[in-house]
């Protein structure tokens, strides 16, 4: 069986890991980095690029670059790239394909299965959309798990004793807080809360607005109206935010940011950490509400927490760390990388599913209450939030009118009292109920939540046994046919990418061979026969001509032909070199013999000597 990889599909960055020798290992991407920007773009030539290359060209190509698509998962939002509309699932699938490819390169084998993480506060439709994205990317999603839970898995893998931990997860676009009890290999989530629209992007936006307003006051130009200038502001804001985590002040310098009648204008502003804290104070405070709620739901006080784990790049912001420390009363744990820990936890869960890890039990919860709309537009809960999953609950309802032969089941998720204030997950109808006075028919509604947190609902007329059921689909409304089409499109793109890579490699090899051939011909002089040189020259010219066209097979064929001709040329060069070496060796041997002979040419050598008497001795 192939490896199951663990993927943290993030708003700003994504990460992939695998279990090796019982330990989670982060897989570096093709660019050599441990995280991959969640950015997709199309170049001016119509080539799709993902990750670091896409992020690098965003300033010069903002209209064809998509970031932070995770914020739109589970909605009917569409983006246009290269004159084509894409759903958030398709854009996410492109990021997943890149991670899949990098994992395959690292492992040296095909990867078809994955565990993907989502924010704990993701709704059913957002989870379903994530699963669809995996499928479009060619991955069977074995499990969807919550990001804070994954982080706890990575943290608690080698910990002894019972602990209560709080996972504070502030990513690029979402915020979650979860409370877990860890002990004897059991990871039990006791409460979770969060905000699906709060993250690092919001902190960046405060800096962007601050810079833009200052510039507008000085020059009367709003940089936010210019797509290219706005992209430069975004990059500068993100960089400044990161720098202010380690220094007290940073300089934001963007020369030639725009052009007015008076000439080019430059942006040059110093931003202090104190000013940044002032701009984002309310955002930091927004993280405290869900934190208090999670503690309240779990029936715990701040003093009951043994350890605080920070997850997500935005938790590097000093004001965030300070707020957590002040509220809980202890400094957060710093021994884990907040950008990688979620993917590592996903890899551990993948190991559990593959049977490679057998001493871990994960008990997760549903983040929001589930129920149906009843008479008067009331939201009637069947499953309360923070219920351990998988779970199943049923409740008997009845008709609201005489002789009612069908009932509409309106499935909802949320915490508000009225149905209209909660999130609609789906609707279906149970028909064929025998006419009867209101209150007589008995309709049993059953909710099942699987281990992925995905909801299945059924309604049954207890009188007739008639049953109707629904698996809640993403509210983006993707049908099975649409998903299948997207899978095929993604596969086609994958094949196109492989072909493009093959073409690049073939061209690079051919270019290199042409250069090497020209160099060899120049250096060989008259060491090889004219006939062989002419053949090599002809093969080289044919390859150069093939390189001017787009036929990859032709390039490969002409490359091989030139290689064959070069073999003959090389053979002659080696033979020539060998012959010269032998002649040189023979010449040296002859010279040595002459020297030895010359040392005794028959002449008498006179030697002076002195005779010594014995007495002088």
Swiss-Prot record:
Induction: By stress conditions e.g. heat shock. One of its GO terms (molecular function) is unfolded protein binding. The keyword Chaperone applies. Residues 575-592 have a biased composition (Low complexity). Residues 575-617 are annotated as: Disordered. It holds the Pfam family HSP70. Residues 607-617 have a biased composition (Acidic residues). The modification Phosphothreonine is found at residue 174. Acts as a chaperone. This is Chaperone protein DnaK. It comes from Halothermothrix orenii (strain H 168 / OCM 544 / DSM 9562).
């Amino acid at each position: 069986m192939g490896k199951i990889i663990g993927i943290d599909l993030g708003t700003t960055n994504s990460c992939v890991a695998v279990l090796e020798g019982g330990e989670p290992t982060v897989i570096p991407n093709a660019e050599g980095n441990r995280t991959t920007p969640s950015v997709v773009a199309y170049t001016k030539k119509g080539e799709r690029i993902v990750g670091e290359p896409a992020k690098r060209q965003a300033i010069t190509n903002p209209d064809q670059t998509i970031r932070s698509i995770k914020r739109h998962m589970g909605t009917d939002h569409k983006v246009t790239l290269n004159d084509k509309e894409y759903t958030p699932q398709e854009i996410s699938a492109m990021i997943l394909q890149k991670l899949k490819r990098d994992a395959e390169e690292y492992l040296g084998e095909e990867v078809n299965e994955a565990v993907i993480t989502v924010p704990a506060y993701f709704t059913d439709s957002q989870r379903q959309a994530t699963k669809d994205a995996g499928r479009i990317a060619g991955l069977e999603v074995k499990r969807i798990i919550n990001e804070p839970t994954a982080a706890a898995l990575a943290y608690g893998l080698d910990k002894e004793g019972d602990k209560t931990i709080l996972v504070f997860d502030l990513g690029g676009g979402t915020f979650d807080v979860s409370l877990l009890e860890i002990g004897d290999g059991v990871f039990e989530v006791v409460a979770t809360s969060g905000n699906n629209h709060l993250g690092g992007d919001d902190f960046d936006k405060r800096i962007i607005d601050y810079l833009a307003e200052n510039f507008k006051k000085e020059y009367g130009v709003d940089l936010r109206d210019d797509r290219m200038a706005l992209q430069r502001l975004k990059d500068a804001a993100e960089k400044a935010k990161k720098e202010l985590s380690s220094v007290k002040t940073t300089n934001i310098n963007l020369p030639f940011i725009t052009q007015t009648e008076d000439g080019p204008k430059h942006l040059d502003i110093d931003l202090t950490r104190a000013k940044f804290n002032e701009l984002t104070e309310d955002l930091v405070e927004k993280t405290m509400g869900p934190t208090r709620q999670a503690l309240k739901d779990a029936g715990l006080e701040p003093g009951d927490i043994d350890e605080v784990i920070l997850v997500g790049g935005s938790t590097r912001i000093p004001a965030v760390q300070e707020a957590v420390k002040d509220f809980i009363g202890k400094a957060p744990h710093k021994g884990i990388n907040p950008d990688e820990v979620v993917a590592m936890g996903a890899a551990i869960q993948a190991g559990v599913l593959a049977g490679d890890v057998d001493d871990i039990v994960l008990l997760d919860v549903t983040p929001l209450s589930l129920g149906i709309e009843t008479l008067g537009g009331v939201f009637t809960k069947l499953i309360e939030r923070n219920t351990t999953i998988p779970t199943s609950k049923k409740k008997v309802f009845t008709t609201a009118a005489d002789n009612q032969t069908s009932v509409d089941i309106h499935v909802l998720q949320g915490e508000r009292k009225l149905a209209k204030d909660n999130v609609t997950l789906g609707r279906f109808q149970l028909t064929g109920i025998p006419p009867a006075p209101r209150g007589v028919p008995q309709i049993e509604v059953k909710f099942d939540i699987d281990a992925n947190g995905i909801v299945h609902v059924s309604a049954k007329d207890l009188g007739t046994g008639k049953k109707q059921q629904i698996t809640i689909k993403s509210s983006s409304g993707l049908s099975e046919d649409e998903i299948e089409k997207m899978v095929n499109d993604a596969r086609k793109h994958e094949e196109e990418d492989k072909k493009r890579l093959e073409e690049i490699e073939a061209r690079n090899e051919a270019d290199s061979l042409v250069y090497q051939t020209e160099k060899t011909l120049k250096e060989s002089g008259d060491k090889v026969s004219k006939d062989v040189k002419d053949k090599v020259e002809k093969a080289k010219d044919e390859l150069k001509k093939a390189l001017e066209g787009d036929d990859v097979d032709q390039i490969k064929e002409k490359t091989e032909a030139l290689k064959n001709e070069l073999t003959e040329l090389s053979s002659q060069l080696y033979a020539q070199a060998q012959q010269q070496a032998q002649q040189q060796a023979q010449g040296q041997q002859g010279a040595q013999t002459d020297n030895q002979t010359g040392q005794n040419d028959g002449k008498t050598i006179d030697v002076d000597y002195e005779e010594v008497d014995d007495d002088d001795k």
